[in-house]
A protein has these predicted regions:
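Short amphipathic alpha-helix adjacent to the substrate-entry channel of hydrolases
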Residues: 90-118
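Primarily recognizes the serine-hydrolase "nucleophile elbow" in alpha/beta-hydrolase
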Residues: 146-222
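Alpha/beta-hydrolase active-site loop
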Residues: 131-153
Length: 343
């Protein structure tokens, strides 16, 4: 067989394969367009790329800082807060207004240590009558993680050394991803969704312990005799957000089989197993008082306390700060990330 015949046969076989196999997905190299950094980097050697699309929706985008390196680098992914109804990835380009988080300085510290940094957007919930509920937002963040892993070579990152971070809703999302079993769908036609969702570590601030909101009553705030129906009288707007959180049209659906199953899918507390990654958590911004305001309900010290209690009982390493409790090591957010990235 001469060379031309061999090439013709191979080409024909590939053509037939493409016609008969819808699963065939060709690898397209991610093309990055670099722009000016939104924060002054000084003499740090790093590039910045913004609004990279990771999915079909308008808010399926992320920005990334990439340190110059001749080897793949660790990566920190930041997921913004906002109660799943507001917020955006650009929040990290200025220090937090209350002084609790100096994002730009921390980003520069990471870049100096040859650690890349990404910040993502995701779809938000409608304030009233969202048909999909919070899984819409959570699954967007999942896809962002998988997309980045799928393009790890183009981004020069080490896909098995990714640390998730976030505040408020982004904190809870990070924990949901960290404590979920691997959500790789190996038979999916979409190559992105075949990627593992396992991460090296999670570091969060002002988090929620679970998105099964029933456990706010029965577990987290049990000592306060907290009841959602009583809370709705204090904060009527929360009534609509509560329904949208699970895609409910009525609160009467809350204990139905469908919504009970939905709540189970977002209960990261119950997802904890001993093989889950080490985490760092700090809920220090709100007073340790009865949860009678929205920001206290969602950012209370007892969320971090509950996470630590469950993790300790299972055997998951953790560094926690809440109320008057401080981890014996005093390890900071950045120091935790540096330690885990270098392990």
């Amino acid at each position: 067989m001469n060379k031309l015949q061999f090439i013709a046969i191979i080409a024909a076989l590939l053509f037939i394969s493409c016609e008969n196999n819808d699963d065939l997905v060709l690898d397209n190299q991610l093309e990055l367009n670099y722009s000016y950094s939104p924060i002054p980097l000084g003499d740090i050697n790093a590039k910045f790329s913004e609004d990279i699309s990771y999915g079909p929706e308008a808010r399926n985008t992320f920005d990334i800082f990439l340190p110059d390196s001749d080897q793949p680098t660790p990566l920190v992914i930041y997921i913004h807060g906002g109660g799943f109804i507001s917020g955006n990835k650009e929040i990290v380009y200025e220090p937090m207004w209350n002084g609790s988080w100096d994002f730009p300085e921390e980003i520069k510290t990471l870049l100096n240590a040859k650690i890349a940094f990404a910040t993502i957007n995701y779809r938000l919930l409608e304030f009233k009558d969202d048909p999909d509920g919070v899984l819409k937002s959570l699954n967007d963040s999942k896809r962002a993680l998988q997309f980045i892993k799928n393009n790890s070579k183009a981004l020069n990152i080490y896909k098995n050394n990714i640390i998730l971070t976030g505040s408020s809703a982004g904190a809870g999302t990070s924990l949901w991803l960290g404590f979920s079993d691997d959500m790789a769908d190996l038979s999916n036609k979409d190559k992105v969704l075949r990627e593992s969702t396992r991460v090296k570590a999670v570091a969060v601030k002002a988090t929620q312990a679970t998105y099964d909101l029933e456990k706010f009553q029965s577990l987290i705030f049990a000592e306060y005799n907290f009841k959602w129906m009583d809370y709705f009288e204090l904060d009527p707007a929360m009534y609509h957000r509560f329904k949208s959180f699970y895609g409910m049209s009525s609160l009467n659906e809350f204990y139905t089989e469908d919504i009970t199953n939905y709540r189970r899918k977002v209960d990261m507390l119950s997802m904890m197993t001993e093989d889950d990654p080490e985490f760092w958590v700090a809920n220090l911004q709100k007073p340790v008082v009865a949860p009678t305001q929205n920001t206290i309900v969602t950012h209370h010290a007892y969320h971090a306390k509950t996470l630590k209690t469950w993790a300790d009982s299972i055997g998951i390493a953790n560094v926690a700060y809440y109320g008057d409790y401080e981890h014996p090591t005093g390890e900071s957010f950045v120091d935790f990330i540096l330690r885990k990235a270098m392990e």
